[in-house]
C-alpha cells in the first residue's frame, strides 16, 4: 500500500492555523472603527469611507517592514513589540503627508506555525493600531517550510490613510527662515539594525542579556524599544497650526530623508547640540568606530520625526507637543541653498 501524503506532513498545519485565527479575532476587534463593515474572515476587508467628513478625499498608501530588528526579537524570544514597530513604520509615513491612517493589513511569513508566538506578534500589531487610531481589517499568515526555518519569520505591513485634497503636506510652502522641530524617538526605532548587530554582536562580542554602562536595560531590551507612533500628536497639531513639512527619520537618517520634503532652493541646517542624543547611539558609534556622517545617515540619533514650521508658530508648537507628552526641540532652520552647502548640514 502506498503511503498517503498530507499538507501537515509537508509542514503546513491547517488546524493550528485555524486555532491561531480563533485566538486573534477578539484582539483584532479591539482596533475596529465605525467605518469597518465586516469582521475578519472574508476574502477582503471592507471599509466605508465617510464622505460627510471629507469631501474631496485623497488616499495615501504606505508599506514597510521591521527589517533585521526581528533578529533581536528572536534572540530574546520576545515577540510582543515588533508588531508595534510594524505599524509605526507605515502609519508614520502616512501622517507625514497630512493624512490620517484609517486601516492596516499585515503579512506574516513563517517557517512553521507557532500559535503562541504569532499571537504575540498580533498583540503588538493591535497595540500599534490602537495607538495610531487605525483599524486592522485583514492580514495573511503564510506558512512556508523550506523558505524559512522552523523558528524564522518576517513581517510586512500595509496602511491606507486619507487626507482632504488641498491639505496634503508636501513641503511646497517651506521658506528660508522656517524652523525645524525635532520630536524625540524611543531609541533606535526600526532602521540600522544590520549595522547594530554587526557592531554589538560580531565586533564587540556582546550578548542580548549583557548590560552596558549608561543604559538601564539589557542590550536586548534597549534594542527592542518599540518605534514611537506620532500619529495622534501630529493630527492634534494640524488642527491648530500650519505644518509646512514633516519628515519621518527612518532609513537614510537625516541626510537622505530631509531632502525628500525640503525644496531644492533651500537647505536645512541641523544643530546637533540642541537635543540630548540617547546613550545607545554613542555606544554604537564608539564600539563600531563609526564616522559621524555615517551615524546621521543611518540612525535617527534620538529624533524620530521632524516638523518644519514658520518661526512665529515654533514656540507654540513645541509647547503643545510637550503638553501632549512628547519631547520636542528646536533643532535647526531652513536657509538658502548655494553651491557650497549640502542639502542638509550639521553644526
Swiss-Prot record:
The alphabetical list of record keywords is: ATP-binding, Cytoplasm, Ligase, Nucleotide-binding, Purine biosynthesis
Q: What class of enzyme is it?
A: ligase
- Check the record and name the Pfam families matching this protein: AIRS, AIRS_C
**UniProt KW Lipid biosynthesis keyword:** no
Q: Can you name one GO molecular function term for this protein?
A: phosphoribosylformylglycinamidine cyclo-ligase activity
Q: Which cysteines share a disulfide bond?
A: none
Give the record's pathway.
Purine metabolism; IMP biosynthesis via de novo pathway; 5-amino-1-(5-phospho-D-ribosyl)imidazole from N(2)-formyl-N(1)-(5-phospho-D-ribosyl)glycinamide: step 2/2
Which reaction(s) does its UniProt entry say it catalyses? Answer: 2-formamido-N(1)-(5-O-phospho-beta-D-ribosyl)acetamidine + ATP = 5-amino-1-(5-phospho-beta-D-ribosyl)imidazole + ADP + phosphate + H(+)
Enzyme Commission number: 6.3.3.1
- GO:BP terms for this protein? 'de novo' IMP biosynthetic process; adenine biosynthetic process
A GO cellular-component term linked to this record: cytosol
Main location, first listed in the record? cytoplasm
Query: According to its UniProt record, where is this protein located?
Result: Cytoplasm
- Keyword Ligase attributed: yes
Instruction: Supply the NCBIfam families for this chain.
Output: purM (TIGR00878)
UniProt similarity note: Belongs to the AIR synthase family.
The protein depicted here goes by the name Phosphoribosylformylglycinamidine cyclo-ligase
| Native species | Syntrophus aciditrophicus (strain SB)
Gene symbol of the encoding locus: purM
Amino acid at each position: 500500500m502506498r503511503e498517503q501524503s498530507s499538507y501537515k506532513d509537508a509542514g503546513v498545519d491547517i488546524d493550528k492555523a485555524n486555532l491561531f485565527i480563533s485566538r486573534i479575532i477578539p484582539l483584532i476587534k479591539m482596533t475596529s472603527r465605525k467605518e469597518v463593515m465586516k469582521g475578519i474572515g472574508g476574502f477582503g476587508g471592507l471599509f466605508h469611507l465617510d464622505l460627510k467628513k471629507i469631501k474631496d478625499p485623497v488616499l495615501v498608501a504606505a508599506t514597510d517592514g521591521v527589517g533585521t530588528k526581528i533578529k533581536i526579537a528572536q534572540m530574546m524570544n520576545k515577540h510582543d513589540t515588533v508588531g508595534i514597530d510594524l505599524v509605526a513604520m507605515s502609519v508614520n509615513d502616512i501622517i507625514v503627508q497630512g493624512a490620517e491612517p484609517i486601516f492596516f493589513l499585515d503579512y506574516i511569513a513563517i517557517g512553521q506555525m507557532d500559535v503562541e508566538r504569532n499571537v504575540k506578534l498580533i498583540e503588538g500589531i493591535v497595540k500599534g493600531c490602537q495607538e495610531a487610531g487605525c483599524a486592522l481589517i485583514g492580514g495573511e499568515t503564510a506558512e512556508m517550510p523550506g523558505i524559512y526555518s522552523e523558528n524564522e519569520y518576517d513581517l510586512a505591513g500595509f496602511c491606507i490613510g486619507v487626507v482632504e485634497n488641498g491639505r496634503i503636506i508636501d513641503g511646497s510652502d517651506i521658506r528660508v527662515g522656517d524652523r525645524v522641530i525635532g520630536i524625540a524617538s524611543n531609541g533606535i526605532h526600526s532602521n540600522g539594525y544590520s549595522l547594530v548587530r554587526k557592531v554589538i554582536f560580531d565586533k564587540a562580542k556582546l550578548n542580548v542579556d549583557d548590560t552596558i554602562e549608561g543604559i538601564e536595560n539589557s542590550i536586548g531590551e534597549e534594542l527592542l524599544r518599540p518605534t514611537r507612533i506620532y500619529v495622534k500628536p501630529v493630527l492634534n497639531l494640524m488642527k491648530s497650526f500650519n505644518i509646512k513639512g514633516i519628515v519621518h527619520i527612518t532609513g537614510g537618517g537625516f541626510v537622505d530623508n530631509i531632502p525628500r520634503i525640503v525644496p531644492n532652493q533651500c537647505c536645512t541646517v541641523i544643530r546637533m547640540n540642541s537635543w540630548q542624543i540617547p546613550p545607545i547611539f554613542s555606544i554604537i558609534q564608539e564600539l563600531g568606530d563609526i564616522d559621524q556622517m555615517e551615524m546621521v545617515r543611518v540612525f535617527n540619533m534620538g529624533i524620530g520625526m521632524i516638523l518644519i514650521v514658520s518661526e512665529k508658530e515654533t514656540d507654540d508648537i513645541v509647547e503643545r507637543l510637550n503638553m501632549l507628552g512628547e519631547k520636542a526641540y528646536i533643532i535647526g532652520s531652513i536657509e538658502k541653498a548655494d553651491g557650497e552647502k549640502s542639502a542638509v548640514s550639521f553644526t
